[in-house]
């Protein structure tokens, strides 16, 4: 395939866009990556080999997909824009190990897709150049999906990348930080300049690699744990107590059970959630369960 001009080549990217009368759509957060060094870096960071099954999110016109296909055993790419799906049918024609699925990744049962495309219980690597406006919901879904993944390598807005490893008490510290801490270790792998894209975004970007970890404290139902975490941060400037009342109600018996739960884990009701560690919030979750506030 040495004679194939890379899709990411700026001239070819523009030719493809012109051929199909396409332009980057703001509603899908589209920016086309045209820097081969960055693309090769993403593949290298993910450690893609000929034995790997890869899920890609948001292939666009196929610049990253092409690089993945050259290294992976099989790539399944999810694209929400039907116009891009039509383009991909042509740009990825040389690669018989790629399948493009037109769907919103937030509506996909990944476990089912993986079982169907790769085999029951298959391990996958997930690679994505995510639309910045929807990065957090997609990351949350990937982390909480009941699938086996070796790593997740994601291009995202630098500001979001900074939130992944934010320190307690900082403005960046929140639900996303805590979710990452429970499921994964985050590493900022590549800093990406705006000039790497067509059109250039107004923000800096970064490639982050997530690797799975065993949680320090495993809970019976992570979804319920993070429902409590989310509720605790619902109003960042309010105390944990006020957010708890909003979650569970203001009846006197409920207030007493909330207070008993807080006392049992030595958390002051006046504290804000941004001052609490994952271990503290996990302990609070267990205490709230013992009080019958979480079924």
From Swiss-Prot:
It catalyses: adenosine(1518)/adenosine(1519) in 16S rRNA + 4 S-adenosyl-L-methionine = N(6)-dimethyladenosine(1518)/N(6)-dimethyladenosine(1519) in 16S rRNA + 4 S-adenosyl-L-homocysteine + 4 H(+). GO terms for cellular component: cytosol. The lineage of its organism: Bacteria, Bacillati, Bacillota, Bacilli, Lactobacillales. InterPro entries: KsgA/Erm, rRNA_Ade_diMease-like_C, rRNA_Ade_Mease_Trfase_CS, rRNA_Ade_methylase_Trfase_N, rRNA_adenine_dimethylase, SAM-dependent_MTases_sf. Its EC number is 2.1.1.182. PROSITE patterns: RRNA_A_DIMETH, SAM_RNA_A_N6_MT. Transmembrane segments: none annotated. The keyword Transferase applies. HAMAP family: 16SrRNA_methyltr_A. Keywords: Cytoplasm, Methyltransferase, RNA-binding, rRNA processing, S-adenosyl-L-methionine, Transferase. This is Ribosomal RNA small subunit methyltransferase A. NCBIfam families: ksgA. S-adenosyl-L-methionine binds at residues 31, 33, 58, 79, 104, 129. Specifically dimethylates two adjacent adenosines (A1518 and A1519) in the loop of a conserved hairpin near the 3'-end of 16S rRNA in the 30S particle. May play a critical role in biogenesis of 30S subunits. Gene3D superfamilies: Ribosomal RNA adenine dimethylase-like, domain 2, Vaccinia Virus protein VP39. It is an enzyme of class 2 (transferase). It is found in: Cytoplasm. Disulfide bonds: none annotated. The keyword Methyltransferase applies. Belongs to the class I-like SAM-binding methyltransferase superfamily. rRNA adenine N(6)-methyltransferase family. RsmA subfamily. GO terms for molecular function: 16S rRNA (adenine(1518)-N(6)/adenine(1519)-N(6))-dimethyltransferase activity; RNA binding.
């Amino acid at each position: 395939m040495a004679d194939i001009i890379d899709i990411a080549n700026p001239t070819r990217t523009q030719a493809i866009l012109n051929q199909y009368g396409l332009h980057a759509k703001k509603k899908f957060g589209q920016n086309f990556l045209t820097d081969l060094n960055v693309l090769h870096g993403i593949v290298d960071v993910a450690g893609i080999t000929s034995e790997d099954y890869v899920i890609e999110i948001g292939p666009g016109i196929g610049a990253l997909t092409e690089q993945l296909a050259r290294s992976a055993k099989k790539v399944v790419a999810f694209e929400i824009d039907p116009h891009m799906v039509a383009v991909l049918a042509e740009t990825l024609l040389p690669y018989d190990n790629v399948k493009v699925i037109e769907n919103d990744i937030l509506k996909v049962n990944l476990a089912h897709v993986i079982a169907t495309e790769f085999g029951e219980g298959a391990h996958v690597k997930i690679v994505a150049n995510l639309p910045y406006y929807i990065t957090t919901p997609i990351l949350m879904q990937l982390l909480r999906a009941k699938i086996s993944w070796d790593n997740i390598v994601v291009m995202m807005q630098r500001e979001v990348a900074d939130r992944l490893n934010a320190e307690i008490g900082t403005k960046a510290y929140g639900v996303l930080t805590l979710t990452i801490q429970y499921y994964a270790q985050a590493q900022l792998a590549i800093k990406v300049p705006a000039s790497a894209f067509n059109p250039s975004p107004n923000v800096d970007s970064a490639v982050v690699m997530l690797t799975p970890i065993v949680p320090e404290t495993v809970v019976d139902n992570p979804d319920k744990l993070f429902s409590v975490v989310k509720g605790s941060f619902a109003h960042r400037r309010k105390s944990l107590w006020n957010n708890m009342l909003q979650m569970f109600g203001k009846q006197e018996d409920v207030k007493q059970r909330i207070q008993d739960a807080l006392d049992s884990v030595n958390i002051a009701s006046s504290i804000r959630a941004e001052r609490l560690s994952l271990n503290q919030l996990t302990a609070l979750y267990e205490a709230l369960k013992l009080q019958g506030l979480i079924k």
